[in-house]
Amino acid sequence: MAFQFPDHFRFADTHEYASLDGDLVRVGISAFAVDQLGDIVFVDLPEVGDLLNRGTTFGSVESVKAVEDLHAPISGELVRINESVLSSPDELQNDPHGEGWLLVVRPADPAQLQDLMDAATYANKVAVE
């Protein structure tokens, strides 16, 4: 299955994305990861005000197949979570790159985004997985 990934997104090896929006970064998981998980039944996210460190676990997604940890693609302060995916995980399932985003971070160092894969590189990576 071929996936479309927004050109302005940056992706971690662990399938989380980061999208710069002004001075904040929106974080979620890729459509590829959602597809691999299957039906998502539960999402666990940290609390607003928590500090995230790039590469460390910040929550989890539970599907009928597995529970997968979520890893921060960028370091910073959590300023907003998407409450709707907590109450309705199907939003993540149905629109992971849009309404199914997970959280918004005020980055400690926006340059960390450059360490993530661009959409084309990520698409090539998942094409062989």
Swiss-Prot record:
Q: Identify which cofactors the protein needs according to its UniProt entry.
A: (R)-lipoate
Q: Does the UniProt entry include the keyword Signal?
A: no
One GO location term (cellular component): cytosol
Q: Which Pfam families match?
A: GCV_H
What's a GO biological-process term for it?
glycine decarboxylation via glycine cleavage system
**Where's the Lipoyl-binding domain?**
24-106
What are the record keywords, sorted? Lipoyl
Please list the residues that carry the modification N6-lipoyllysine. K65
How is the co-factor bound, per the entry?
A: Binds 1 lipoyl cofactor covalently.
What does the record note on quaternary structure? The glycine cleavage system is composed of four proteins: P, T, L and H.
According to its UniProt entry, the function of this protein is described as: The glycine cleavage system catalyzes the degradation of glycine. The H protein shuttles the methylamine group of glycine from the P protein to the T protein.
Q: Which family does it belong to?
A: Belongs to the GcvH family.
Put simply, this protein is called Glycine cleavage system H protein
Kindly list the organism's lineage. Answer: Bacteria, Bacillati, Cyanobacteriota, Cyanophyceae, Synechococcales
